[in-house]
């Protein structure tokens, strides 16, 4: 769409197209679409000013339902302007903040801003962290309430549309169209007022965020100007790019003349051990090397300075790197298998030996224990014999009771 056709478009069509671009910009759009949306919304602002839709002497009750949506034009333009990619980021931030302040100021004139926000702005902002936290919580609650209310209005409108359609299909009697139109008008006004309230909550949060970003960028720019490093970022990027390109070019050139040796893998070495061409204890060189990630490929495998150590830790994998190579793991398992086989052979030899012929050697304390057992056994036998010779009560038979 050219500039001429955009000027010929009516205001409702321009606003609808700009609001669609604003809604799609919340996810991801290209810069051409963002700039086009900014141009459309600027055209909307120009047409609103020419038509004189709003006046500073009016309030929200004086504005018609059809014109309420145009209050959101500066807010939409501020959010799209903030998403514009430009070398001068501070300039973009200032332009976006100007539109946000214009939107908030106009809403305050129309009595659309909550009293809590007005009190905070008149006091010069919340000073303590407790006040800032309370303000953010109250704003978050208003935002959630506005979102819930918009969803409720949408569902209510859909239900009424379905019921109206079903009633029209079931009965040929004409329904009261005036009541339906009145309900639609009230819902539309309520929806736009709620949308403006939601936009105010987001506008206050965005304005605070842009102010902090502008302060940080201004401080960085001032520091660079003081140190004479105006072109610091671009020069560093060019130097790093050149260094990386040189390293890859040299590596590609070396690859044509260097023939890598065939690596001794775990499988080939195990096959050599099985077939008798190598021993388990034989030392050999492992060709598997751990991967190098990120700037570690530039600083080398053994960083010396603290800067190189920090650079080598950038872009590391999210998982833990192996502590041993594949060959070392295979050798460890092979040693475990050899020990297990030797232990099984020893157990088989002990099982097949003449264990019944080999008298087990007695331990030093076993003889004393056997002697104690024999003495206790003799004592028990003697006591049994005495009880047989002297039954219970045998010595009291001749005694007479005392008279």
Swiss-Prot record:
Listed GO biological process terms: regulation of dephosphorylation; regulation of signal transduction; TOR signaling
First-listed, main subcellular location of the protein, grouped into a coarse class: cytoplasm
UniProt note: phenotype after gene disruption: RNAi plants show severe growth retardation, the formation of spontaneous disease-like nectrotic lesions leading to premature cell death. The defective plants also display a strong reduction in protein synthesis, the induction of autophagy and nitrogen mobilization.
Nucleus is among the record's keywords: yes
Keyword Cell cycle among record annotations: no
GO-annotated molecular function: protein phosphatase 2A binding
Keywords: Cytoplasm, Nucleus
Function: Involved in the regulation of the TOR signaling pathway. Seems to act as a regulator of PP2A catalytic activity.
Protein name: PP2A regulatory subunit TAP46
Organism whose genome encodes this protein: Nicotiana benthamiana
Gene designation per UniProt: TAP46
